[in-house]
Structures are given as C-alpha cells and as structure tokens.
Amino acid sequence: MAIKLRLTRMGSKKRPFYRIVAINSETRRDGRPLDFCGYYNPMVEPVEVKIDKEKVEKWLERGAEPSDTVKSLLKANS
C-alpha cells in the first residue's frame, strides 16, 4: 500500500478549497483519507496555507510520497 500526501478538493463550485491529506495512492481524489495534515486556500489574497508539520513529518517517515503540488507547498512553508 503506497501512501501519498496530496490535495483533496473541498468548497463549492468555482470556490475551491483544498485539504492536504495522507491517502492510499489507489484511492480516488476525494476518497477517505488516512489523516488530515493541513489545508490550502488559493481563493484569498494572500494565499492561505496551514500545514501541521508534525503530521507531515510522521507520514514522510512512514514512506509517504508528496505530490508535486504538496511538495511545492511544503517547500514554500518551511
């Protein structure tokens, strides 16, 4: 079972809001996650990002691989 850190879409139509989640790589985009690790709101100025670094580090130690977008969010907020 490969674990990924990726975004899952929330919010309403044309007002996206994303949660950063740890999820099985075979699960659909909005499927049931293993853990919530933060959120990303691109619709406000400035862009709002909150990441629980302890949870992210825990999942990275367990072998989770971040998606490209999550990787760039982690780099910007470190």
From Swiss-Prot:
Q: Name one GO biological process term.
A: translation
- Cross-referenced NCBIfam families: S16
Alphabetized, the UniProt keywords read: Ribonucleoprotein, Ribosomal protein
Q: Which domain of life is it from?
A: Bacteria
Protein name listed in UniProt: Small ribosomal subunit protein bS16
Query: What GO CC annotations are associated with the protein?
Result: cytoplasm; small ribosomal subunit
Q: Does the keyword Ribonucleoprotein apply?
A: yes
Which organism does this record belong to? Maridesulfovibrio salexigens (strain ATCC 14822 / DSM 2638 / NCIMB 8403 / VKM B-1763) (Desulfovibrio salexigens)
Q: Which gene encodes it?
A: rpsP
Taxonomy-wise, where does this protein's organism fall, top ranks first?
A: Bacteria, Pseudomonadati, Thermodesulfobacteriota, Desulfovibrionia, Desulfovibrionales
Disulfides per UniProt: none
Tell me, what's a Pfam family for it? Answer: Ribosomal_S16
Please name the GO terms that the record assigns under molecular function: structural constituent of ribosome
UniProt family annotation = Belongs to the bacterial ribosomal protein bS16 family.
PANTHER family linked: 30S RIBOSOMAL PROTEIN S16, SMALL RIBOSOMAL SUBUNIT PROTEIN BS16M
InterPro entries cross-referenced by the UniProt entry: Ribosomal_bS16, Ribosomal_bS16_dom_sf
